[in-house]
Design a protein with these regions (language model features):
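Acidic, polar-rich low-complexity tracts and alpha-helical solenoid repeat scaffolds
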Residues: 2, 27-294
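Bacterial N-terminal signal peptides
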Residues: 15-25
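Low-complexity intrinsically disordered segments
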Residues: 11-12, 23, 76
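Coiled-coil-like amphipathic alpha-helices with heptad-repeat character
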Residues: 8, 25-28
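Bacterial N-terminal signal peptides that target proteins for export
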Residues: 2-16
Length: 294
């Protein structure tokens, strides 16, 4: 009996030994697999890897490499540049809120950095692009009909670039983008003014048109605002002010359709009943129609 028990215990010991070896091998494999390939990589190599990923348009991969660099090497010129390029990668990937957060963190940490003008410029790009990006792509919504809080922040960012860093390489483009944003804000006011006009609220329509002219002079919609002022004064029975508006408009845009009694025209009512038609600006539609006739 003793000999038989010893013989039977041998296979058991062999099986137990095999199980130990299997578990050990599995553990080693998992440890190797779980180890990040970038861990321990020299800072120069890690930065070069992230930069190459950016050049190839792999924004997510670049962001990951730059974040790994910052985690492993929290100080130094490579770290500062990696933080900047990580924010750019986030912006290019459409992660605008993340980009703005990264930029704000950098500005707080390095307020006098040599590339600080670029950071404000990039924040302007991200803020100007962050509002309902998906909806604009799918439904082609007019930019002036959106919430304008982030475009206004973008305008403030570009204004910082032009005022604090007028000689930077980003100042000229920032000025141009400010002009475009002012037109968006003016269009927003024009759409509101036309909304009131369509409903016969002529005092409110005149007030919006006046605000547009005072707040956004020389915008692309200034002549429309003058025309709407004239139309409002006609309906309010103020012939003198209506005639003044007509004279001003004739000097600045003699071909404006209001002078021929053919303005404003509103979108066809059936369009508003179609949920798939997209939201269009009455101001833009009328202005584009005039431009096409020229």
């Amino acid at each position: 009996m003793i000999r038989r028990s010893l013989l039977l215990s041998a296979p058991v010991r062999i099986t137990a030994l095999l199980l130990v070896l299997v578990f050990a091998a599995t553990g080693c494999h998992r440890g190797t697999k779980g180890k990040n390939a970038d861990e321990g990589m020299p800072v120069e190599k890690l930065y070069e890897k992230g930069h190459k990923l950016m050049e190839g348009g792999n924004w997510s991969g670049a962001e990951s490499s730059f974040k790994r660099l910052v985690a492993q090497y929290p100080y130094g010129p490579y770290t500062e540049q990696a933080m900047i390029e990580s924010a750019y990668a986030q912006y290019k990937a459409g992660k605008n809120d993340d980009a703005v957060s990264s930029i704000d963190r950098f500005i707080r940490t390095y307020p006098t950095h040599r590339n600080i003008a670029y950071l404000y410029y990039l924040r302007g790009l991200a803020n100007g692009n962050s509002d309902t990006v998906f909806l604009r792509r799918v439904w082609s919504l007019d930019s002036s009909r959106r919430d304008l809080s982030t475009p206004r922040q973008a305008y403030a960012d570009f204004n910082i670039v032009t005022e604090r860093y007028p000689n930077s390489r980003y100042a000229a483009d920032a000025r141009q983008r400010m002009i475009e944003l002012r037109d968006v804000f003016a269009q927003h006011e024009m759409d509101n003014a036309l909304y009131y006009a369509r409903r016969g609220a002529w005092i409110s329509a005149a007030g919006r048109a006046t605000y547009l002219l005072e707040t956004y002079p020389q915008s692309a919609f200034q002549n429309d605002a003058v025309a709407l002022l004239g139309e409002s004064y006609v309906h309010l029975g103020n012939k003198a002010l209506a005639d003044d508006a007509r004279r001003v408009l004739a000097l600045n845009e003699p071909g404006h359709p209001w002078l021929q009694g053919d303005w404003p025209k509103y979108p066809w009512i059936a369009r508003k009943l179609n949920p798939f038609a997209g939201e269009k600006s009455a101001a833009t539609g009328q202005r584009n129609a005039r431009m096409n006739r020229k």
